[in-house]
Every structure is written in structure tokens, then in C-alpha cells.
């Protein structure tokens, strides 16, 4: 549903631009950082699962490249797009493109936690996701893994934010810096293990 609604909203925005509406569109990467611990804060929830040993194995191949962007950088990018963005332009507001292997190594270093080395094959992850989704329906909880999420893990999600950098002076922080801030916040609210 997430991808479908994103696609539909993008199509509507493009149609509005074509009709002369002065819109500026932004596309953030995978957003993380301090904020509500909701279903939408997927990376932070994932980090907490890692920190508390709730993930015996990692999903997705280590070489998959994703783009992670700190929440404050997205907010600054949106503000810059509102102030300086050219009507009709679309901007990718990303952070660093890193492999999943690099992400987990960095999470282990920054968070002082042991990260599993075992990788779950896609077919097993999909089956586990189906079971978790069914259990969540029965209990009213939020599944930690779903078949849709497993499908997302099967792809690269790397982006180039050079247009935003050139036109909006967009300068996101490093992944290490963002993770350090995020882990410090999680410690402060008592969610990260001591």
C-alpha cells in the first residue's frame, strides 16, 4: 500500500504541475532519527530490535545499497525547497548511499551492540513475514516483518541528491553523525540498552 499511495500522489503532483500549479516535489530517502517510535519510523524500530536482540538474523543481502537520511536534514531540505526550489522541479533529499553491510557495521560501532552476521534467505524471510503479519492481525500488534517489507529489502534504494545540493544548498550530515544522535536520543529516553 505504501508504494502504491506514493506512486498515486506523485502522479497527481505531476498532473498538477503539467496544469500549471507551481509545485515543488521532494523525495526523501529512508528517514531516521529522533521522533515518535511509530510504525513509520522503520529504521529506528529496526535499530531497537537489533539492540535488544530481537533479530536473530538480518533480512536482505549485505551488498544492497540504500539511502539513509536524518530527519532534520529532510526538514531543512523541505524548507529550502519551499524557499528556493523552482516550480515544477523535483528534488531527491537523501543522505549517504551505503550497503546494508556497512549500515549494520556502523550501527554496531556507534551503538556498542553485537549485530547478527547470519542472513535470512528471502524465501524464509517472506514466510516469517507472513506469519508475523497474521499474528499481528490476531493480536492487534504491529508486525516486525511483512512480505511487503521483505520485497523492499530485495532491491537497491540508492539515490543522487546532487540537484538538491546544487540548487537548494542541501547538505545532509553523515550517516555516522545521524546514528550517533539517534542512539544518544534512544539512550536518553531509556529505549537503548545500557
How does the language model describe each region?
Residues 11-34:
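Conserved beta-loop-beta element that borders a ligand/cofactor-binding pocket
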Residues 31-33, 74, 98:
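Conserved sequence/active-site signature of Rossmann-fold short-chain dehydrogenase/reductase
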Amino acid at each position: 500500500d505504501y508504494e502504491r499511495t506514493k506512486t498515486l500522489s506523485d502522479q497527481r503532483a505531476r498532473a498538477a504541475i503539467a496544469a500549471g500549479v507551481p509545485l515543488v516535489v521532494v523525495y526523501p530517502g529512508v528517514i531516521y532519527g529522533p521522533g515518535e517510535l511509530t510504525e513509520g519510523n522503520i529504521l529506528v524500530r529496526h535499530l531497537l530490535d537489533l539492540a535488544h536482540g530481537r533479530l536473530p538474523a538480518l533480512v536482505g543481502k549485505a551488498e544492497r545499497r540504500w539511502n539513509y537520511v536524518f530527519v532534520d536534514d529532510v526538514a531543512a531540505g523541505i524548507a529550502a525547497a519551499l524557499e528556493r526550489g523552482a516550480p515544477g522541479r523535483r528534488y531527491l533529499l537523501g543522505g549517504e548511499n551505503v550497503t546494508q553491510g556497512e549500515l549494520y557495521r556502523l550501527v554496531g560501532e556507534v551503538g556498542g551492540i553485537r549485530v547478527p552476521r547470519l542472513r535470512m534467505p528471502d524465501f524464509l524471510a517472506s514466510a516469517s513475514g507472513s506469519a508475523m503479519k497474521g499474528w499481528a492481525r490476531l493480536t492487534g500488534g504491529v508486525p516486525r516483518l511483512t512480505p511487503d517489507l521483505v520485497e523492499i529489502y530485495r532491491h537497491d534504494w540508492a539515490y543522487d541528491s546532487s540537484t538538491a545540493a546544487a540548487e537548494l544548498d542541501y547538505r545532509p550530515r553523515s550517516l555516522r553523525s545521524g546514528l550517533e544522535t539517534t542512539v544518544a536520543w534512544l539512550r536518553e529516553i531509556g529505549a537503548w540498552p545500557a
